[in-house]
Amino acid sequence: MTAMKDKVVIVTGAKGGIGLATAQLFAKEGASVALVDRNEPKQEAQDLIDAGYQAISIQCDVSDEKSVEAMVQKTVDTFGKLDYAYNNAGIQNPMTDTVELKEEVFDDVMNVNTKGIWLCMKYELLQLRKQGTEGAIVNCSSIGGLIGVAGRSVYHASKHGVLGLTKSTALEYASKGIRINAVCPGIIVTPMVENMLVTESDAMDELMKAVPIGRLAKAEEVASVVLWLCSSSASYVIGQAISVDGGYTVQ
């Protein structure tokens, strides 16, 4: 399929889970894809290249400004431009009472999940402005950006912050032809969630019971929403937080 033919997209957090599924979907739709992760996704990019797609891997710490700037530049140096970005990189911390949180844990989560989104948007937008072209950016929040859960204060704060960044920046760039939106995934089958199913089984069991559709989501189900938000089919969608959660947050 060629819905994204001649387009260039950055996908962060592309080593696995939703990020990898999104990178694979964009590649299959004809885009040239920069797979970005703190742990460089060399094999994941090579698998796409071996399948006949256009891809590169880039090691990047999204919480570090120079690393993010270099990542965007390498993408442009390789593919000649930038059209879209899915800022997906994020980390989780163990369930912890707010007063028991360590400062370094708070800082780590906020630096990756919120500051990282800001830095990625900053350099992606600078590149789109330099090109003078339209484009689209999708940021990964979470159902944790819409609700609260006891023991998840810093993670949920970081994901609420993503929505604030998304909505405000979307207003800044709507008139410039650059659309910015967010996805809010629910409980997705990813390595991070699979680990939580083991380490926090009681809490996850209770959460699963509250999902109306009665199952975990597949990473590909989120990827398809990201693809749609970047496509011309979503040309009038700006500053929105799209839940992909099996009905969890409408209860």
Give each language-model segment a name.
Residues 92-95, 147, 227, 238-251:
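Short C-terminal tail/terminal secondary-structure segment
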Residues 15-16:
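Conserved glycine-rich cofactor-binding loop
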